[in-house]
Regions:
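Short, highly selective alpha-helical patches that border small-molecule cofactor pockets
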Residues: 14, 18-22, 73, 161, ...
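Alpha/beta-hydrolase active-site loop
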Residues: 17, 37-56
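Short hydrophobic segments within beta-strands
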Residues: 6-11, 64, 88, 148
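The alpha/beta-hydrolase serine catalytic core
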Residues: 81-163, 167-202
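Gly/Ala-rich beta-loop-alpha elbow adjacent to hydrolase catalytic centers
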Residues: 64-73
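Short, surface-exposed "cap/lid" segments of acyl-processing enzymes
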Residues: 1-39
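Short coil/turn segments at beta-strand junctions that form active-site/ligand-binding loops
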Residues: 2-3, 58-61, 83, 143-144
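Aromatic pocket-lining residues of Rossmann-like dinucleotide-binding sites
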Residues: 76-80
Length: 202
């Protein structure tokens, strides 16, 4: 069986991160997706074209996606033929994240609607168009999925990730000392072990 693994990075990441996963998928082709999309509607255009171009000739395609890369993937690739997905610290409720950022920045919905975009002191720009989009197009995902979540994730609550996993029937693994960004030696060891276990049949 000819198998392709597509890796989708998170914010600030790069397609080069796919190299980390190649030893874990020795009998598969592993590629990283160096996407340019900054919004889910841009991803909806860009992601399917990448998938269609690179998945030709493969019997099985596995998706590994990180953080907002997972959100963009679920928004754009739900209708594609994926054998399974593995999400690391996925953003699964973008509306909740945006409203949380609004609360942290003390921005009301009326203010955002009026100004359309508001920059925050912690580097995120709030967008009324973005908020309206995520409300209009909620995530619908039925691909067999496994999720790795850090107990200290500051962007997605335990309640949110557990509820999402239950809703889509995903297997959820929690590393209590893990953060949103898995990067320490211990965290990466847990990630690698989780990937190895996830390769087995779901």
């Amino acid at each position: 069986m000819k198998r392709l693994v597509i890796y989708v990075h998170g914010k600030g990441g790069s397609a080069e991160e796919a190299k980390h996963y190649r030893p874990l998928f020795a009998e598969s082709d592993v590629i990283g997706f160096d996407y340019h999309a900054q919004t889910p509607w841009e991803a909806k255009y860009e992601f399917p074209r990448f998938f269609d171009l690179h998945s030709k000739g493969y019997d099985s395609v596995i998706l590994i996606a990180n953080s907002i890369g997972a959100y963009f993937s679920m928004n754009a690739l739900a209708g594609k033929k994926l054998s399974r997905a593995m999400f690391i610290s996925p953003i699964v409720d973008m509306e909740r994240l945006i409203t949380d950022i609004m609360m942290w920045a003390k921005v009301t919905e009326a203010e955002l609607e009026s100004k359309k975009e508001i920059s925050t002191e912690f580097g995120e720009t709030l967008s009324w168009e973005y908020l309206c989009y995520v409300r209009k197009y909620p995530i619908r995902w039925s691909i067999p999925t496994r999720i790795l979540y850090g107990g200290k994730d500051h962007l997605t609550s335990r309640e949110t990730i557990s509820g999402f996993a239950d809703r889509i029937g995903a297997d959820l693994t929690v590393m209590e000392d893990g953060e949103h960004w898995f990067h320490t030696e211990e965290q990466m060891n847990v990630l690698d072990h989780w990937i190895s276990n996830s390769i087995r049949p779901l």
